[in-house]
Amino acid sequence: MTGQLVQYGRHRQRRSYARISEVLELPNLIEIQTSSYQWFLDEGLREMFQDISPIEDFTGNLSLEFIDYSLGEPKYSVDECKERDVTYAAPLRVKVRLINKETGEVKEQDVFMGDFPLMTETGTFVINGAERVIVSQLVRSPSVYYSGKVDKNGKRGFTATVIPNRGAWLEYETDAKDVVYVRIDRTRKLPVTVLLRALGFGSDQEITELLGDNEYLSNTLEKDNTDSTEKALLEIYERLRPGEPPTVENAKSLLVSRFFDPKRYDLANVGRYKINKKLHIKNRLFNQRLAETLVDPETGEILAAEGTILDRRTLDRILPYLEKNIGFKTAKPMGGVVEGDVELQSIKIYAPESEGERVINVIGNANITRDVKHITPGDILASISYFFNLLYKVGDTDDIDHLGNRRLRSVGELLQNQFRIGLSRMERVVRERMSIQDTNAITPQALINIRPVIASIKEFFGSSQLSQFMDQTNPLAELTHKRRLSALGPGGLTRERAGFEVRDVHYSHYGRMCPIETPEGPNIGLINSLSSFAKVNEFGFIETPYRRVDPETGLVTGHVDYLTADEEDNYVVAQANMKLSEEGEFLDEDIVARFRGENIVTNKERIDYMDVSPKQVVSAATACIPFLENDDSNRALMGANMQRQAVPLMNPESPIVGTGMEYVSAKDSGAAVICKHPGIVERVEAREVWVRRYVEVDGQTVKGDLDRYKMQKFIRSNQGTCYNQRPIVSVGNEVVKGEILADGPSMELGELALGRNVLVGFMTWDGYNYEDAIIMSERLVKDDVYTSIHIEEYESEARDTKLGPEEITRDIPNVGEDALRNLDERGIIRVGAEVKDGDLLVGKVTPKGVTELTAEERLLHAIFGEKAREVRDTSLRVPHGGGGIILDVKVFNREDGDELPPGVNQLVRAYIVQKRKISEGDKMAGRHGNKGVISRILPEEDMPYLPDGTPIDIMLNPLGVPSRMNIGQVLELHLGMAARYLGIHIATPVFDGAREEDVWGTIEEAGMANDAKTILYDGRTGEPFDNRVSVGVMYMIKLAHMVDDKLHARSTGPYSLVTQQPLGGKAQFGGQRFGEMEVWALEAYGAAYTLQEILTVKSDDVVGRVKTYEAIVKGENVPEPGVPESFKVLIKELQSLGMDVKMMSSDDTEIEMRDTEDDDDHQSADKLNVEVETTKE
């Protein structure tokens, strides 16, 4: 036997073909959501309140401080919130202190600041009763970026940008004449020396001393019209505020507020970290030749002589001195924006390309501390110095698609930014109220208006592009949605603007973002998925784990380091499949490794790190595809995406050929019931499981509290699939923390089970599997193999109207007793009733305007009190294709104290459940991107059968394999067959699964033929087919594209208001568009009358269609068609352009067109009791 047995959960053993031992457990897969939100509750909120306090009024006399905050208990549980359509939230209370500096009076109060949405245990939010997910956003990190550009004459230049988290941008660029310019906040460009003068370096000499003499600087100084700090300030002010009279004071305060005011300019932690990293002198001196001797100022010791090349060793030696004191200079700017001195660090080096001894100044920003969040003059000088250095080939340009320069904004940060907007709006209100209200009687509660805060949070959860309705089709879809990374959204890219480079796979994605899982279509590459082992660090950069190689011994240790893309660029990393000895020594001398995006073969001494696992490259969904290594990447992409569309089946099976990821994915998805404390199972029911806890007391294990775990039974998911949990433990089982107690939807025995294992043959059959179509045995219908349950929710509300309240009642005008047989006395359908299209669910009547009655009618009304004319029937009926069994009915009444929207008195919800067997037209797929539509369901007896008489279940077209290059399905087929004969389950992990020899070995062990094919007999004739056929077990899933949802036919329905043509689409009960090309086809056939009918009475000849309906009802001949409405619209449009357009007959008389507002059609419609509906488009 090849492979070894591995236990997954309590119930499932698989034979695993993995050769590489896993050093690291997979992390919790939804940690990206939960930990980010936890950070927000613990620190993010506190940061916000610290940033904003104190709020002072304009005189500085009153000051309002936020001291502490606390979250209360939520009003309802998560399940109750879903039922009542409310938000799962907890009240946020803030302790506020108001200080009156004149009187010294201090008032403290607890202020309620709205209900704050809470995250559920599974990483989602319940907003207005619907589960939503906040997707993480990939954005450019705030930092300073340098990039090369080539102008139209082929001359190389550079551009640089300092991008803050919020605030004004600073951009540098060169032009064709070698002048360096700066743009402040996207305005017109100025020579860069103007900015330096404005900072207080007024004379040419000071600037030259700072940056070192070079021709770029002299060109720029020539171009610069200013010659003093004052002139430079005025020049900048004129650019930023054109049209306002410039003064030096105004210019200073403008620059200070633009760049040096922490409230207006914020780099955030990550921006400060990136800028320090980029501009710090130690990173810029690497491999450069010194042009001065470095001396320790304290001892006078020479650390490095002039002309020394600073390699890694030398740099490491002088690093402590660099951090401390070498090259520190204090610049003393005069009269500029900057008050006080500027600390700089400057060292001279030789330019690498110069023949002579051209000296360059390298200016560092003297490593500003982490808590300075705004930009400093030191940063500006260092960034300009870096720019000049680049012109002499010192320094690197940046790649903005590198993951070291893109970071994630997860839930916590997105919420914090939104909360900040709300607080700053509130701050304005507080300031205004401080100056208006009486200072003595004022209280914190009276100052604070919480509306803007609540509004900004509501707006974010309700309508932000990143707050999405959770994809709940199956557990894998849920999990993937929570791990999604989007480059779209506010502050991100747009689909139209995003180029090819942003979407492409980049070498830094390795182990961080999945190169396979991304949507097809306009969003390709903009929406990605987090790799299986990846984590997000405090700065929002994605890290991936590597095993450290001990530099002394060269052994691979068990120690794991998480590296960001930036850090990884400094190391040589070996692949996970390198052969190791027991101790962890590399067995090969030459090793395939990666270094900065290049694959290199290098000596084992040079290796710094090694991959943790082969599946660290791919995401959770991609890691569920067995034999991924044998599939073409385009098809693997489809396979990963289609698994997310699998409909939960009534009785699912986990795959015979799996990858070992099924257990982890199912457990972390949040669909299963997980045990929270170790204990023993005391009771198991369909709806709950009781676990008695084990507690340690004095070293003894004793029984403690009882935990009751409730199951969700037949709940409608967001996508209308059925969400149902079933217990998989028995009474007396001892369970541990984290064990699965109950399967969720699409799970079996604790493993993900999206489809079923079926017997598949690759063969054609009478051409029915042309173009990827699938032929299926009727057994799969009869035995409910692919039967799924779907639940649809319908609601009806009784509102107050101008003419009186609507009423939910059994007494409906013009409806026979037969139609009411399933309604109870309230007029609401009973649970368990079977309903068909058009049946009543909720009887409801709406008052209609009373017309003037004649005397006789009034008399009748007085005698019989006949009410039929005053109300019209607005009952809720079952729509087309919606029939089924009533699963549940919920009634909410205003009188009973239920929270309902304004104007609604009663709300009724009915849930209809359908059991959908598989049928022709349904879409199915394997896990390798092999999808198809069922074209024929054959009786079992007509299916080809194996020599032992077993009919096969599905026939696939063999031509679907070679051109698509997804050979994984063939390997899965053969291995699955062998596993079925052996009665085992198999795990073949991604990139480390069964090799060819393993597959053949298992086939031999199972006693199958040595070509793994078999003779098949035709079920109709009993004759064997000419050739042997590949038959085996394949895992097939039923996708959420079902024919029942797509089939649609229109009778008389709504029309568009302007053109009077039928609407389009199933949702509007619309028609099929008969377009230009279809008209050509009928013209070609000479079918003139058919065509005229289609273009007039079946479409927009308003009078004609009513008359035609009348003629059909009365059995008369259909009248002549009239003028289509769209023709009248065309004429009106031409007339609106000022053209005189008339319709003339052949004898030059004008034809009068009657207007649509003709009562004729409405009268004839009334006679026939037809409702003529018109709808706005």
UniProtKB/Swiss-Prot annotation:
Q: Which Pfam families match?
A: RNA_pol_Rpb2_1, RNA_pol_Rpb2_2, RNA_pol_Rpb2_3, RNA_pol_Rpb2_45, RNA_pol_Rpb2_6, RNA_pol_Rpb2_7
The superkingdom of the source organism is Bacteria
Coiled-coil region list: none
Which reaction is catalysed here?
Answer: RNA(n) + a ribonucleoside 5'-triphosphate = RNA(n+1) + diphosphate
Gene Ontology cellular-component terms listed: DNA-directed RNA polymerase complex
Concerning Gene3D superfamilies, the annotation shows:
2.40.50.100, 2.40.50.150, 3.90.1100.10, DNA-directed RNA polymerase, beta subunit, external 1 domain, DNA-directed RNA polymerase, subunit 2, domain 6, RNA polymerase alpha subunit dimerisation domain, RNA polymerase Rpb2, domain 2
| Record field: compositional bias (Basic and acidic residues) | 1162-1177
| Residue ranges, compositional bias (Acidic residues) | 1147-1161
Keyword vocabulary terms for this entry: DNA-directed RNA polymerase, Nucleotidyltransferase, Transcription, Transferase
Q: Give GO BP annotations, semicolon-separated.
A: DNA-templated transcription
Q: What family is this? A: Belongs to the RNA polymerase beta chain family.
* HAMAP family tied to this protein: RNApol_bact_RpoB
Under the subunit heading, UniProt states: The RNAP catalytic core consists of 2 alpha, 1 beta, 1 beta' and 1 omega subunit. When a sigma factor is associated with the core the holoenzyme is formed, which can initiate transcription.
Q: Name it.
A: DNA-directed RNA polymerase subunit beta
State the gene name recorded for this protein. Answer: rpoB
